[in-house]
Amino acid sequence: MRIIVVDNYEKMSKKAAAMIASQVILKPDSVLGLATGDTPIGMYKEIIDIYKNEKMDFSKVRTFNLDEYYGLNRENPQSYYYYMMNNLFNHVNIDENNINIPNGMADNIEIECKEYERKIDKAGGIDLQILGIGVNGHIGFNEPNISFESETHLVNLNEKTIESNSRFFSSKEEVPTKAISMGIKSIIHSKKIILLACGSAKSDAVSKAINGKINPNIPASILQLHRDVVVIIDKEAASKLNLK
């Protein structure tokens, strides 16, 4: 695990975007695992800037998003499909057939989850996976005490996650209580992983994930076992880390 501590959110975003650009330049048909939420928005803006400067080509890139709220259709502004189109896909030359996001309105969740795993396998696995980390240590929507053997599945969101995500909705009551998420096993099979975190609110989760014991209660702690993880965090998120 390589840990890069930067001064602020902007530098974190630039560093992550540069690493994604390098991946795509080296392997134009890269399979990218993408995340949503506040943390990667700056990274996506930086990627768009790189693309506009003709230094990045998305025409052969394939993407798989980590998760999607269950019960939200794609037109809902709070859906992660809407988020991805607005923050990245509408601004680059990606083939829409190469975009993969779980269907939050699927009639049969079990089939949807198995098909998502099949698509990842058929693509050859994820070359580079982007992750954020929740205040409770979750990655994707894999909440504490999730099995490390889990694949794409339907998740019951816990109270802390619902509370944290309520800032994106008009009220806490509007936040979906379930989501479809790639599982820990799905994530850990990625060839390379970049974990992003910014701000003091994430410092405890970051410290437990990196310095603590590998424990299903802190899902991100499983990353300690991965052979190629880069953690890019600002000074506030790193404030409780033991970097010795």
From Swiss-Prot:
Which pathway is it part of?
Amino-sugar metabolism; N-acetylneuraminate degradation; D-fructose 6-phosphate from N-acetylneuraminate: step 5/5
Which SUPFAM superfamilies does the UniProt record give? NagB/RpiA/CoA transferase-like (SSF100950)
Query: Could you name the active-site residues?
Result: D67, N136, H138, E143
| Classification via CDD domains | GlcN6P_deaminase (cd01399)
Gene Ontology BP annotations: carbohydrate metabolic process; glucosamine catabolic process; N-acetylglucosamine catabolic process; N-acetylneuraminate catabolic process
Q: Name one Pfam family in it.
A: Glucosamine_iso
The organism's place on the tree of life at top rank:
Bacteria
An example Gene Ontology molecular-function term: identical protein binding
Q: What is its EC number?
A: 3.5.99.6
Catalytic reaction(s) noted: alpha-D-glucosamine 6-phosphate + H2O = beta-D-fructose 6-phosphate + NH4(+)
User: What is any one of the record's Gene Ontology cellular component terms?
Assistant: cytoplasm
Q: Which UniProt keywords are given for this protein, alphabetically ordered?
A: Carbohydrate metabolism, Hydrolase
| Family, similarity comment | Belongs to the glucosamine/galactosamine-6-phosphate isomerase family. NagB subfamily.
Function, as annotated: Catalyzes the reversible isomerization-deamination of glucosamine 6-phosphate (GlcN6P) to form fructose 6-phosphate (Fru6P) and ammonium ion.
For this entry, the protein name equals: Glucosamine-6-phosphate deaminase
In which organism is this protein found? Clostridium botulinum (strain Loch Maree / Type A3)
